[in-house]
């Protein structure tokens, strides 16, 4: 089993994700090979909360060119984690 801190890379804090915090939904960038159960277990272990469900989105790398060299940026994976109503909040996202 992977270390939970290898699965969850960083929180995504934008205006849109801060609006979702009121609905008990928290957004993280996760490892591209992590599945929903791994993300759920990692969030529960790191933050000590109860997770109700996990939604995951994949983003492909964008094409970039610098002079005559071209390539793609790294692909990413984003997870929106919904907490149960009786769970405590994650302090990282407090305003």
Curated annotation (Swiss-Prot):
Q: Which HAMAP family match?
A: Ribosomal_uL23_B
Q: Which domain of life is it from?
A: Bacteria
- What are the UniProt keywords, alphabetically? Ribonucleoprotein, Ribosomal protein, RNA-binding, rRNA-binding
**What GO molecular-function term can you cite, just one?**
structural constituent of ribosome
Under what name is this protein listed? Large ribosomal subunit protein uL23
What PROSITE patterns does the database record attribute to this sequence?
Answer: RIBOSOMAL_L23 (PS00050)
Function per UniProt: One of the early assembly proteins it binds 23S rRNA. One of the proteins that surrounds the polypeptide exit tunnel on the outside of the ribosome. Forms the main docking site for trigger factor binding to the ribosome.
Q: Which GO terms describe its cellular component?
A: ribonucleoprotein complex; ribosome
Instruction: List, in alphabetical order, the GO biological process terms annotated in this UniProt record.
Output: translation
* KW RNA-binding (keyword) present: yes
- Hey, which family's this protein in? Belongs to the universal ribosomal protein uL23 family.
The record's note on quaternary structure and interaction partners says:
Part of the 50S ribosomal subunit. Contacts protein L29, and trigger factor when it is bound to the ribosome.
> Which positions, given as ranges, span the membrane?
none
């Amino acid at each position: 089993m992977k270390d939970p801190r290898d699965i969850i890379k960083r929180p995504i804090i934008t205006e849109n994700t801060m609006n979702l915090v009121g609905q008990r939904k928290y957004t993280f960038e996760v490892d591209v090979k992590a599945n929903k159960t791994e993300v759920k277990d990692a969030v529960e272990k790191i933050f000590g909360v109860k997770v109700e469900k996990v939604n995951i989105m994949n983003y492909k790398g964008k094409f970039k060119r610098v002079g005559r060299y071209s390539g793609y940026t790294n692909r990413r994976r984003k997870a929106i984690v919904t907490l149960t109503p009786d769970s405590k909040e994650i302090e990282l996202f407090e305003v």
